[in-house]
């Protein structure tokens, strides 16, 4: 959101050593979906126009701010990505699909928030997201880096309206 982006910009201005290594880009990473508005910016001071479950507020997306992850990496001539933080409130599957070529070939570590209650709103189930992540040859790990053997059973234990963070790392066959 614009609010979060302004805060990040201000923070970087205070950290000159970090600023020279970081390029800020306010974009909507997507392969297919191009919504005109998205739920974000949790405003705890107002009850107006909040999402019924996660309480985000609706914000407009600029028309020219859409790009796929594959195209962004190509456009910016990015050679190496070590880590991706993915917390996009239901758009996870679309973001991952938008970077399919890059993710299949490079396997950066991904820190992802999985919130099963959100996905039906976007036309898919959590099982579809998990299947796609496995297809990309990633394994699931807890926040304390313990490998999850049966992710399908694990996510079924996430309470309705809840979410959990996971690390995704390259799968190795033994």
Where are these regions (language model features)?
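Phosphate/nucleotide-binding beta-alpha loop and adjacent structural elements of enzyme active sites
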Residues: 1-174
């Amino acid at each position: 959101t614009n609010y979060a982006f302004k805060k990040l910009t201000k923070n970087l201005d205070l950290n000159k050593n970090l600023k020279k290594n970081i390029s800020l880009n306010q974009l909507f990473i997507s392969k297919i979906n191009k919504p005109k508005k998205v739920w974000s910016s949790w405003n705890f001071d107002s009850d107006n126009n909040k999402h019924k479950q996660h309480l985000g507020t609706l914000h407009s997306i600029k028309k020219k701010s859409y790009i796929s992850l594959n195209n962004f990496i190509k456009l910016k001539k990015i050679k190496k990505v070590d880590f991706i933080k993915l917390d996009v409130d239901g758009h996870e599957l679309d973001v991952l699909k938008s970077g399919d070529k890059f993710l299949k070939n490079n396997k950066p570590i991904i820190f992802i928030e999985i919130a099963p209650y959100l996905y039906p709103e976007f036309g898919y189930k959590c099982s579809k997201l998990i299947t796609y992540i496995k297809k990309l040859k990633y394994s699931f790990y807890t926040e304390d880096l313990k490998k999850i053997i049966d992710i399908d059973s694990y996510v079924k234990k996430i309470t309705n309206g809840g979410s959990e963070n996971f690390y995704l790392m390259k799968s190795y066959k033994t």
